[in-house]
Amino acid sequence: MMMETRDPAIKLFGMKIPFPSVFESAVTVEDDEEDDWSGGDDKSPEKVTPELSDKNNNNCNDNSFNNSKPETLDKEEATSTDQIESSDTPEDNQQTTPDGKTLKKPTKILPCPRCKSMETKFCYYNNYNINQPRHFCKACQRYWTAGGTMRNVPVGAGRRKNKSSSSHYRHITISEALEAARLDPGLQANTRVLSFGLEAQQQHVAAPMTPVMKLQEDQKVSNGARNRFHGLADQRLVARVENGDDCSSGSSVTTSNNHSVDESRAQSGSVVEAQMNNNNNNNMNGYACIPGVPWPYTWNPAMPPPGFYPPPGYPMPFYPYWTIPMLPPHQSSSPISQKCSNTNSPTLGKHPRDEGSSKKDNETERKQKAGCVLVPKTLRIDDPNEAAKSSIWTTLGIKNEAMCKAGGMFKGFDHKTKMYNNDKAENSPVLSANPAALSRSHNFHEQI
C-alpha cells in the first residue's frame, strides 16, 4: 500500500525523474503477468496501467521541452543580430568626437582643387573638426583639407628616390602634331618620349632614315616654330651677318650641305665660311641625328661639350645647361668685325677703350686658335750641373748666374751622393760578407 500512495517520480523543471525502485517493481510486475496470463487474473493489468500512463506522460513532457528550447534560442539570436547591426551602422557613416558628438560622413564628392578631377574620396575629419574634412585625390595622389592649403608633395614621394631615372620623364608628352606623324606605332598621347637600354638602340638602328627626312620637311608646330632635331642630310647653319650699318641685327641664313652653300657664301662672305667650318667640326654641339620621333621642344644652343655625354645605352637624367658659361664663338679678323668694335657702334655691352687691351685680346684669341697649351717641362736630376743650366729656370724667373755663383742649387744632393759613394767604397768589403745587410743598407740609402 505504501508503494501505491508514494509518488513514483520527482518533477523538476517540468520533467519527471523516476526512482530505481520503480524500474525494479516494473520488472517484477512484467514477470508476474507472464506467469499469470494463462490463469486469467484481472488484477495484473490494473497494476500495470498506472505505470504505463506515467511513462507516457514523461515522454510527452520531454518532447514539449525539446520543442520549446529552439524557439528560445531563435529569439536570442535574433536580438543579438539586431544589436550588432545597430552598432555597426553608425560607425560606417559617423565619427565620434571626444565630447561624444557624432560627425556624419559627407556624401557629396568634391572636385580636386589642383587637377579638377572627380576621383576623390573623403578620408576623415582633421582634429575631429567638422569644418576641416580631409579629402584625397586619386588622380594626382594628394591630400587637401577644406579651408587649408594643399600638399604640394605627392604621397610616398620620399620612397621614390632610388628608382630609375626614366620615371622622372613622365611630364614630357607628345603633342597632337607629333602624334599624327609618329614613327613608332606604340607611342600614343601622354606617353614617354625617352627610352633607355638595348631595346632603344635596336629601334634606332632598325628605323629607316627616309621617314626622318619626311618628318623634317613636313612637320611644323601650330605656332610656326620648328621643334625637331636637325638631320645629317639637312643641317641648318645659322650665320650672323654683321654689317657696319647695323651690327646688332643678324640674319639667320639656312643652308644645306648640297644646294645653298654657294649662295650663302656669296651673301655673307668669309663670316659664313668660318662659322660653317666650326659648325661642321662641332656637329651641332656633339649631337648626332637620332632616328625616331623628333624632340617636342625648341633647340637650345647653350649645350655642354661632346665629352659631357655618356655612351648610348646608359640612362642619365637630362638637365639644362643654364649655369655653366659657354665660350664665345671665334671671331674672324675681318674689317667688318673691327668696325663693330668701335665705341660708337649701336651694340650693347662693354667696349674696349684702350688699344693695349684690344691687342691683348687679339693675342689671346690667336693663342686659342693656334691651340697652344702650356705643358710643364720635366727636369731630370741625373747631373746637377746640367739641371742648373736648364731653360726652365728662366721661365720660372730664376737667374742661373746666382745659382752658379752660390755653388748650384743641387750642391747638397751632389755632396750626399759623394758621401754615399765613399761609404759604399769603405764598407763594401765588410758588407759583402753579409748580403742581407748589404741589401738593407742599399734600401736605407735609397729611402734617404
UniProtKB/Swiss-Prot annotation:
GO terms for cellular component: nucleus. It is found in: Nucleus. GO terms for biological process: flower development; regulation of DNA-templated transcription. Induction: Circadian-regulation. Highly expressed at the beginning of the light period, then decreases, reaching a minimum between 16 and 29 hours after dawn before rising again at the end of the day. Expressed in the vasculature of cotyledons and hypocotyls, leaves and roots. Residues 40-54, 351-368 have a biased composition (Basic and acidic residues). Zn(2+) binds at C112, C115, C137, C140. InterPro entries: Dof (IPR045174), Znf_Dof (IPR003851). It holds the Pfam family Zn_ribbon_Dof. Its main location: nucleus. Residues 26-108, 243-269, 332-370 are annotated as: Disordered. Residues 55-69 have a biased composition (Low complexity). Residues 29-39 have a biased composition (Acidic residues). Disruption phenotype: No alteration in flowering time, probably due to the redundancy with CDF1, CDF2 and CDF5. Residues 80-99, 246-259, 332-347 have a biased composition (Polar residues). PROSITE patterns: ZF_DOF_1 (PS01361), ZF_DOF_2 (PS50884). GO terms for molecular function: DNA binding; DNA-binding transcription factor activity; zinc ion binding. The keyword Ion transport does not apply. Transcription factor that binds specifically to a 5'-AA[AG]G-3' consensus core sequence. Regulates a photoperiodic flowering response. Transcriptional repressor of 'CONSTANS' expression. Interacts with ADO2 (via kelch repeats) and ADO3 (via kelch repeats). This is Cyclic dof factor 3. The lineage of its organism: Eukaryota, Viridiplantae, Streptophyta, Embryophyta, Tracheophyta. The gene is CDF3.
